[in-house]
């Protein structure tokens, strides 16, 4: 029993009922009241949608150009064959993200997963799975199948746009169901510890496709859940700070020399005599100040005002922190 009223009970693995090699019931108890549904629903969702595995993603069938066709001597049409290939349970050695396997069969009778030719890195978990039927002794079928590692469910339509430019005619895409879990359900029953009768017992009933044992699937799902919850333990901000683009302190045009204004020689010389070297120096002067400049009359003043106006500037502007360090150093 827990040491204090604030201490949570921790579940322990009570029973694993192995119904078959692909079907098992796992029971966990005791759980605090309400935790049966909390944990059961979280594990169920992960097991259904987020478990990694391997699946058929592409197939090339000799003599077939598209999925809306049939093949002579084969009972099923191509769409049915693709649907049957989705049910292929394949285990690929760790470290390999994709492999190719081949199928060549002739003669009347069913074509099953066990007829597939593959190397030691591939294992077919359901060799009796039917892919199609050949209808006569002269019928034959040959195909090259691509198996990839992934997670969850990825429909063929989601890969069409990304692979359209590279996919040759005759290479057929297959909806990929990577999850090794076929069925998953959970039930919450009453549990008791000493005098407490308000506890939960979680019973997980699961079937896999044979590429992963049910017990191992639950372990992996629990690991995924724990890793996702780690971020909530200390709630640190792990966002990478965005690099803000530094805006220039002054408009670049203000840093250009007054010579760039292409004033008349008379006006330019008058400004240089007053130590007005940059446009930023000029725009801070007023009309009155410029008219006090020797040899600079109203005609030159009008010229300066017009040239500045054409660049969106004017006399009498106030520039804080002028001059900038780059100019001051010069």
From Swiss-Prot:
The UniProt keyword set, sorted, is: DNA-directed RNA polymerase, Nucleotidyltransferase, Transcription, Transferase
Region span, Alpha C-terminal domain (alpha-CTD): 250-330
What's any one GO cellular component for it? cytoplasm
Q: What is its EC number?
A: 2.7.7.6
What reaction does this enzyme carry out catalytically?
RNA(n) + a ribonucleoside 5'-triphosphate = RNA(n+1) + diphosphate
Which GO biological process categories is it annotated with?
A: DNA-templated transcription
Could you say which protein family the record assigns here? Belongs to the RNA polymerase alpha chain family.
Q: What is the annotated quaternary arrangement, including any partners?
A: Homodimer. The RNAP catalytic core consists of 2 alpha, 1 beta, 1 beta' and 1 omega subunit. When a sigma factor is associated with the core the holoenzyme is formed, which can initiate transcription.
This protein is called: DNA-directed RNA polymerase subunit alpha
């Amino acid at each position: 029993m827990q040491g204090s009223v604030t201490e949570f009970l921790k579940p322990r693995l009570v029973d694993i009922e192995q119904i078959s090699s692909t079907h098992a019931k796992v029971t966990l108890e005791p759980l605090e009241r309400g935790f049966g549904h909390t944990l059961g629903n979280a594990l169920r969702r992960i097991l259904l949608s987020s478990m990694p595995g391997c699946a058929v993603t592409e197939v090339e069938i000799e003599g077939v150009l598209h999925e809306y066709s049939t093949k002579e001597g084969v009972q099923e049409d191509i769409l049915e064959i693709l649907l049957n290939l989705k049910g292929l349970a394949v285990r690929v050695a760790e470290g390999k993200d994709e492999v190719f396997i081949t199928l060549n069969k002739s003669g009347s009778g069913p074509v099953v997963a066990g007829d597939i030719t593959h190397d030691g890195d591939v294992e077919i978990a359901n060799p009796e799975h039917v892919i199609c039927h050949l209808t006569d002794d002269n019928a034959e079928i040959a195909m090259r199948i691509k198996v990839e590692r992934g997670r969850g469910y990825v429909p063929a339509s989601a890969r069409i746009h990304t692979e359209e430019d590279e996919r040759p005619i005759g290479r057929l895409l297959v909806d990929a169901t990577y999850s090794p879990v076929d069925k998953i359900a959970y039930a919450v029953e009453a549990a008791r510890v000493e005098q407490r009768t308000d506890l939960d017992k979680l019973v997980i009933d699961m079937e896999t496709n044979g590429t992963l044992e049910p017990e191992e699937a639950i372990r992996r799902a629990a690991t995924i859940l724990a890793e996702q919850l780690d971020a909530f333990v200390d709630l640190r901000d792990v966002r990478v700070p965005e690099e803000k683009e530094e805006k220039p302190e002054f408009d670049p045009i203000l840093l250009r020399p007054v010579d760039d204004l292409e004033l008349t020689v008379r006006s330019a010389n008058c400004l240089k005599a007053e130590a007005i070297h940059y446009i930023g120096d000029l725009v801070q002067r007023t009309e009155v100040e410029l008219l006090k400049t020797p040899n600079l009359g109203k005609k030159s003043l009008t010229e300066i005002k017009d040239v500045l106006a054409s660049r969106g500037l004017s006399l009498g502007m106030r520039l804080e922190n002028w001059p900038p360090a780059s100019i001051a150093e010069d």
